[in-house]
Amino acid sequence: MVQRSKKYREAAEKIDRNNLYTANEAIALLKSMPEYKFDQTVEAVLRLNVDPRKADQLVRGSVNLPNGTGKTAKVLVFARGPKATEALEAGADIVGDDDLVQKVADGFLDFDSVVATPDMMGKVGRLGRVLGPRGLMPNPKTGTVTMDVTKAIKDIKGGKVDFRVDKNGNLSFLIGKMSFTEQALDENFKAVADEVKRLKPSTVKGRYVTKATITSTMNPGVPVDPAVVA
């Protein structure tokens, strides 16, 4: 059995497990929990009533958070020639072509987001087993396979978050830092929740979101009424 810290137990005692909170109430409750010496990341997890094995139920997308993420993402760009130069000028942290593909294949993963020009995808596609499980594989649907590398980089650096349902139907996403105001975190949550709702597959019957939780790095999750999305 996992031994929880005193702070964690104190935080857990604040949560009424028989209650489903609004997103704003959950955020306020998280912010009332014991503090730590670092700025915790705040995340949300939604359980979707989808079958990710079916292509038409693989929910994925991206959103520019209205209040940013609270961190500056390290962006890796697969590009060559003028597009590589453009990526560097736009603020990309790591830029390269074939050699960089091999470096990532060999285990280099010190980055948060990946952008690729279409001509590089023949090589980048081989990294599916490395990037896919980490949610880092470039995709046209999220604007990360593009010739407009400047826009892609600016969006990511400005607070864009990508999301994708996992094989168990869970969809997790960052909504900010504990230092954010309650309103800022609530607005970020609603921005992603609204986009997830918009992406509801037409083939899904019944309730779309069956469970929702908002949590932070060191604290237990607070149950949120899934009706806020569904």
Curated annotation (Swiss-Prot):
Pfam families: Ribosomal_L1. Disulfide bonds: none annotated. The keyword Cytoplasm does not apply. One of its GO terms (biological process) is regulation of translation. GO terms for molecular function: rRNA binding; structural constituent of ribosome; tRNA binding. It comes from the Bacteria. GO terms for cellular component: large ribosomal subunit. Keywords: Repressor, Ribonucleoprotein, Ribosomal protein, RNA-binding, rRNA-binding, Translation regulation, tRNA-binding. Part of the 50S ribosomal subunit. HAMAP family: Ribosomal_uL1_B. Belongs to the universal ribosomal protein uL1 family. Binds directly to 23S rRNA. The L1 stalk is quite mobile in the ribosome, and is involved in E site tRNA release. This is Large ribosomal subunit protein uL1. The gene is rplA.
